[in-house]
Amino acid sequence: MGSKPNAMKNVVAMAAVSALFLLGFLVCSVSGSVSYDSRAITINGKRRILISGSIHYPRSTPEMWPDLIRKAKEGGLDVIQTYVFWNGHEPSPGKYYFEGNYDLVKFVKLVQQSGLYLHLRIGPYVCAEWNFGGFPVWLKYIPGISFRTDNGPFKAQMQRFTTKIVNMMKAERLFESQGGPIILSQIENEYGPMEYELGAPGRSYTNWAAKMAVGLGTGVPWVMCKQDDAPDPIINACNGFYCDYFSPNKAYKPKMWTEAWTGWFTKFGGPVPYRPAEDMAFSVARFIQKGGSFINYYMYHGGTNFGRTAGGPFIATSYDYDAPLDEYGLERQPKWGHLKDLHRAIKLCEPALVSGEPTRMPLGNYQEAHVYKSKSGACSAFLANYNPKSYAKVSFGNNHYNLPPWSISILPDCKNTVYNTARVGAQTSRMKMVRVPVHGGLSWQAYNEDPSTYIDESFTMVGLVEQINTTRDTSDYLWYMTDVKVDANEGFLRNGDLPTLTVLSAGHAMHVFINGQLSGSAYGSLDSPKLTFRKGVNLRAGFNKIAILSIAVGLPNVGPHFETWNAGVLGPVSLNGLNGGRRDLSWQKWTYKVGLKGESLSLHSLSGSSSVEWAEGAFVAQKQPLTWYKTTFSAPAGDSPLAVDMGSMGKGQIWINGQSLGRHWPAYKAVGSCSECSYTGTFREDKCLRNCGEASQRWYHVPRSWLKPSGNLLVVFEEWGGDPNGITLVRREVDSVCADIYEWQSTLVNYQLHASGKVNKPLHPKAHLQCGPGQKITTVKFASFGTPEGTCGSYRQGSCHAHHSYDAFNKLCVGQNWCSVTVAPEMFGGDPCPNVMKKLAVEAVCA
């Protein structure tokens, strides 16, 4: 995944590759059970329309994986796609880690056990809004290295790790050619735009990477995404919000979409993006309509950036991504259900879709049909209305069809509509965070960091140092400390005009302490990580200690020349307003300390937390910077996902039983425009936004599997100052459920009943409502059959309303976990307005 959706898409085509390289392709294609042709990926000789979804194993827990995979399969997926995260698997050179939520083999085997395929994106560059793009930071310090180009040291390391992963998969017989689930692999990632910048070295590197990958003999095809000149036999694939315009670079390669972006990432300081289900479905249907055969949702489950894995910088801890399965693993409705219905409709068309290319038929200025036919007589059609503002009535095959704005109707038999991308049959679930009562409340203890105690663990040198090279990314924190002598005759001591301290930093945030007191803070943003602190500071006669806590908020994950990236206070650092004018502090002696004292003592762990004396009760200070807080609690009953509400805190990090939930920063409020958003029209990452003026992220996921029945240790490090008494444990659950369905809305169930011959008359659709596990429908908040207006949570009656609209739901739904009601006039006391297109809107409360 790249952070720049509009990067250049067209790259100069490459020259032909060697005969040996082509021979590798021929061996793979002929002998392997997975191959491809111009139309699709073929498995055991059979063309397949494949629906895939990204689930990144480190962004959830092993205990969550089976349920996530099950829900993905239930949602209609054929394939799970994941990156491989090099920095998680090789944290230091030659020291590998494949345990816990980095147990890649276990994850792949769970996918296999579910009956799904897997697309393994080895990279090993992943971008993914992941720290340093997935590269281990130690790569920076290999002599002569230059990342992602024709560079010997880099290529040697890349080949070594890629070979390690491939051999691991082979040893477990996990490639499809061995009977395993892996049907595709990916080498590199979104390299095309960078290759264009680099020129010849970039093209040489692309050719080398492709040849190296194919030479590993996996027996399955390799993919490169956003790589228009991917050498044969590599398939070049598309990433984006829409990919219907895309064509592979050779006529004998299939049209693949490796990243269909289901939403966008959240950044600290930014609103929360979302993508309407109708537009997501529209983009996928349009891709399939125009010849696409493989589509992967990025993300299908986004999950959580635990620990310090978030990149960016400034990527939030939540990687929810508005995915069909939310950060906690719950179905996001209606997106999950609407896409499930889409996948079922596409699969009904598969016999015709895989038979060849479509015939295009214009139906109007903004309307067209794409028709697929097979030699055996199968016929499927996609009717599209690209007008974002108005309905269209079109004629096709001697029938008339009404197409909503910006929508596509799917006709598996070239006659009957079973699905329209703008007509949502799935329920909408409104979620809430409910405070979990903790017996006796959370009783906090506190320990305050003191920069003056760092001398024994520090080093001193003249001038300013770069942060990443100094910390080696072992901590977010680096102290810059120096002394400033102020003469007693300085004018500001008498007139009260404070001297101004100016500190320039390459990123990402800083807190400035003068003589042990917090003087102020400054921070950048994802779009502008560099920052300047400029403020009047309270100095006294004699020696003054300036201590700057420089903070990294995730290392960048996208861009060229990783080896050159920097962070921290690079200067200049200066004082203005002294008798002598400006005093440059940059080249005097500075003392440095990597990390916090609390980190070196492991205060976040069960054992380390007992190594210092903690303040209790009335001695626990509020709004105090550089403070560690700890408390214990018992695990709440039930299975509902849990989170901590950090709304009362500023910025820092959180741990549960020694495991990091990630960075918290609720004090960074979201800046943006959260106006009403329509599903119609071209989507972009800033089109649909929530949370403007509020915390970018308030709640932080607590995996249930990290908890013990009692005595769970919660530790918070707070940089700015907050009120720990405002921290609460919450559970995520369904608040209310809604359905919004037209009287004659097409459904797959009704189509299949007709096709089976079990019924021979038109059938009305049904409204389905279901609360969460353990919940029941308690009340019907709103119900109207007629012309209701508004959206879920804010419905209102229109000019036409059936007065008995509530009756069926009160009778069939109240007291039940789930229910279904036929959307027909007789269910609501008769037709309230004949000759008017009616619909049902209902909202029911769950508890």
Curated annotation (Swiss-Prot):
InterPro entries: BetaGal_gal-bd, Galactose-bd-like_sf, GHD, Gly_Hdrlase_35_cat, Glyco_hydro_35_CS, Glycoside_Hdrlase_35, Glycoside_hydrolase_SF, Lectin_gal-bd_dom. The keyword Protein biosynthesis does not apply. Residues 761-847 form the SUEL-type lectin domain. It catalyses: Hydrolysis of terminal non-reducing beta-D-galactose residues in beta-D-galactosides. GO terms for biological process: carbohydrate metabolic process. Keywords: Apoplast, Glycoprotein, Glycosidase, Hydrolase, Secreted, Signal. Residues 1-32 form the signal peptide. GO terms for cellular component: apoplast; cytosol; plant-type cell wall; plasmodesma. Pfam families: BetaGal_gal-bd, GHD, Glyco_hydro_35, SUEL_Lectin. GO terms for molecular function: beta-galactosidase activity; carbohydrate binding. The active site is at E190, E259. Ubiquitous, at low levels. Its EC number is 3.2.1.23. Belongs to the glycosyl hydrolase 35 family. This is Beta-galactosidase 1. It comes from Arabidopsis thaliana. The lineage of its organism: Eukaryota, Viridiplantae, Streptophyta, Embryophyta, Tracheophyta.
